[in-house]
From Swiss-Prot:
It comes from Chironomus tentans. Used by the larvae to construct a supramolecular structure, the larval tube. This is Balbiani ring protein 1. Residues 42-85, 124-167 are annotated as: 4 X 11 AA tandem repeats. Keywords: Repeat, Secreted. Residues 49-100, 121-159 have a biased composition (Basic and acidic residues). Residues 28-174 are annotated as: Disordered. The keyword Secreted applies. Salivary gland. It is found in: Secreted.
Length: 174
């Protein structure tokens, strides 16, 4: 092939390749159509079915993601719109109080209570809150409870070390 493929041969092959809607590779002196190299011996038979199959196969691929991608952004948009509307100043206080009972953190901007890193579902506060304090207690041991053991170097030593600072300077000291 490289021996046969001179400048005149390349032009002729490139023109044939363009008719088949293919790409001509000058270095390999080959015409590739739809990512597959076309056989020069059977240009009429091989080139016709090849562009048709990719056209059929390529149509459902872009359509399916377009169908699947449409409901995905819509669902969060439906869920996210009512949250800021519901969450007024009174609502935030009530949610923050509920969240404090669960030993969770209340995010005012999102109007959500997160306990042990997981957002609590507002729809099931009574059912969902009972097992959650149990699980967070296990999960949160590394955070608030283990800090009692593991925080000896961090908050407890400061508590011992802080006695001379705020506690040492008490009413007796004054």
């Amino acid at each position: 092939r490289p021996e046969r493929c001179g400048s005149a041969m390349r032009k002729a092959e490139a023109e044939k390749c363009a008719r088949r809607n293919g790409r001509f590779n000058a270095s390999k002196c080959r015409c590739t159509s739809a990512g597959k190299p076309s056989r020069n011996s059977e240009p009429s038979k091989g080139s016709k079915p090849r562009p048709e199959k990719p056209s059929k196969g390529s149509k459902p691929r872009p359509e399916k993601p377009s169908k699947g991608s449409k409901p995905k952004p819509e669902k969060p948009s439906k869920g996210s719109k009512p949250r800021p509307e519901r969450c007024g100043s009174a609502m935030r206080k009530a949610e923050a109080e509920k969240c404090a009972r669960r030993n969770g953190r209340f995010n005012a901007s999102k109007c959500r209570c997160t306990s042990a890193g997981k957002p609590s579902r507002k729809s099931e506060p009574s059912k969902g809150s009972k097992p959650r304090p149990e699980k967070p207690s296990k999960e949160s041991k590394p955070r608030p409870e283990k800090p009692s053991k593991g925080s000896k170097p961090r908050p407890e030593k400061p508590s011992k070390g802080s006695k001379p600072r705020p506690e040492g300077c008490g009413s007796a000291m004054r």
